[in-house]
Amino acid sequence: MTAIRGGSRRAPGLALALLGGVLLGACHGDENAQVNALPGFVSGSVRKTAYDGASDDLLTAGLGKTGLGSDTRPGFANPAQPSAAELRRLAIYSNYRALVDITPNGGYGRFWGPNVDLAGNDTLGEGKIAGTEYLAYSDDGSGRKNVTLLVQVPASFDPANPCIVTATASGSRGVYGAIAAAGEWGLKRGCAVAYNDKGGGNGAHEIGTGVVTLIDGTLATASSAGSSSLFTASESSSTLAAFNSAFPNRYAYKHAHSQQNPEQDWGRVTLQAVEFAYWALNEQFGPVVDGTRHGIRYRPGDITTIAASVSNGGGSALAAAEQDTRGWITAVVVGEPQINVRMTPGVTVEQGGAPVPSFGRPLADYATLANLLQPCAAAAVAATGAPYLSALPMGVTQSIRTQRCATLAAAGLVSGADTASQASDALAQLHAAGYLADSDLLQAPMWDSQAMPAIAVTYANAYTRSRVTDNLCNFSFATTNPVTGAVAAPAVSPMTNLFGAGNGVPPTNGINLVFNGASGGVDHRLATPDASFAGAFCLRQLWTANQLGIGTNVDAVRVAANLQHKPAIIVHGRSDALVPVNHASRAYVAQNSATEGRASQLSFYEVTNGQHFDAFLSVPGFDTRFVPVHYYDEQALNLMWNHLKSGAPLPPSQVIRTVPRGGVPGAAPALSTANLPPIVQSPGANAIAVNAGVIDVPL
């Protein structure tokens, strides 16, 4: 590992970095300088590490296709103190598997995977990719932003034909969060990949011990880490000690508790990741100008750069393209983007020629509503046969659904004399709020898996700039007894492997979402018979009553849908119940057509039977009903590459009518091309009409 000196801060624990590293030096400068200089936002040292493509590599951390596909996750020589290299390996393993279906029947190793080349053929063996990584923080001088930036430069990079692909982390994942979604494609194409963790990352603070994570996942105390931690809660040590006495075994998380509303900066930090990649490429391939330092070979706009990723990372790519004033980004390709659009009057979303009931709502609105209603809507007749995605016994889950419906009815929030009618009304309200009937069977698993409660709580904290000590709406993050759900001390601290195994949004890695009642904190699902309705209702009221500054902070994350005439592709699954297509992609495309008019180069591909979590596709009931959106994300990247390099026209906006695998839940037949029709140049009746602020999607 080599470290390149940047700003005045130096992270502690550099001695724990990968063996064989070195430290290099460079000063900050401007883009007109002849000497390559670190961008001013880079703080501390840059860690440079070479990987041989055999024992370790950029894509699989030495695990190869077989290791990534194995259900046995990589271990640690010393489980109590894993090395940075071991944590990196686990992070790549965990994040890769979190975004794609890893089963052979589901397509791994055949349609995607390290062994599959860009033409879709099994030619790459274990798929290990040699190259170099550059790792650093971006900060504003406060030592509290500490956005992780990472650039991977494959050995196959051609300096005469340079390219960059961004891979901003999805969700609130760490810096490797989009390695499967965009990083893999970029590395195989021979491009440098520019990652960042969006300033949310996987940073946590164990309140009882004061332990925090560092940039490489190793641990330190908050006092010794200082401004070099991924995240440290901002409260004083005395305040945290008092909080720990009243609420032991709690954890602060960066996305939820940094008080920075990090989402407002996601576009900016994605642009910084690109600029950092330019610096790294100049450092590696620029001429030597004074015997030691490198000159500038590439200036803004010289490198073909595709802003890509999925979910939150996809929204970040769109925001970056909108904010790009220096020509860093050439094109955009994103999947299922979580994006909050600033809608203007007259913009309309239609399906089959009729206006949809609701569109363009921000996440703070639809997520808090879904979190309130989904446990009840899950009992609706239309949701019968939904995949079951919970470790709780079915009887417990059914009781939660019945009790949530009853409490909603008592509060006047749903109508009906019995559970069935109350559940049908809850589902009807979700339809009226813009959720498609295509996602009816996903309302239950989105809540049962705790995806929606996790999002509602984390984003409510972020949008209100709450502190961990606020216990917003009586929710907090804690370790719990696996049987009773009550807050309890962990047998082993989850911090040890958090960087490698966590996803940044509790519940994750043994840190759970708890509701703090009169008898203490308990897993929110078990704290009350109606699964902490009071907390869910409180979260909803934050939005509906515009409390604690939530409206202002949500406005700060909205975008204008102005891509500045850059070629772009959005792919989204129609059945998405986490980021509903009416509120995200359809709304964005409609607003873009109003903003850019005929100058827009945006194509939108809506995938029937596609939903948000490809990693769920091996779950019984998911396997038979839903198809991988990732397959079309990769097709879209290939289409954009051909457009940029050979002038091939981008196919027009269209609905892609996929065919579910069918069969028996849990034993669906193998995925084949019969399930996955191609994106076509002439979609005919499947064409999506977009004009002057109106999008009309065929039924």
From Swiss-Prot:
Signal peptide start-end: 1-33
Gene Ontology biological process: butyrate metabolic process
Enzyme Commission number, as recorded: 3.1.1.22
Highest taxon in the source lineage: Bacteria
Family statement drawn from the similarity comment of this UniProt entry: Belongs to the D-(-)-3-hydroxybutyrate oligomer hydrolase family.
GO CC, alphabetical: extracellular space
GO molecular function, one term: hydroxybutyrate-dimer hydrolase activity
Protein location: Secreted
Biological role stated in the UniProt entry: Participates in the degradation of poly-3-hydroxybutyrate (PHB). It works downstream of poly(3-hydroxybutyrate) depolymerase, hydrolyzing D(-)-3-hydroxybutyrate oligomers of various length (3HB-oligomers) into 3HB-monomers.
Primary subcellular site in the record, as a coarse category: secreted
Chemical reaction(s) catalysed: (3R)-hydroxybutanoate dimer + H2O = 2 (R)-3-hydroxybutanoate + H(+)
Protein name: D-(-)-3-hydroxybutyrate oligomer hydrolase
Keywords assigned: Hydrolase, Secreted, Signal
Pathway(s) per entry: Lipid metabolism; butanoate metabolism
Organism listed in the record: Burkholderia pseudomallei (strain K96243)
Active-site annotation: 311
Keyword flag Mitochondrion: no
InterPro entries: AB_hydrolase_fold (IPR029058), OHBut_olig_hydro_put (IPR016582)
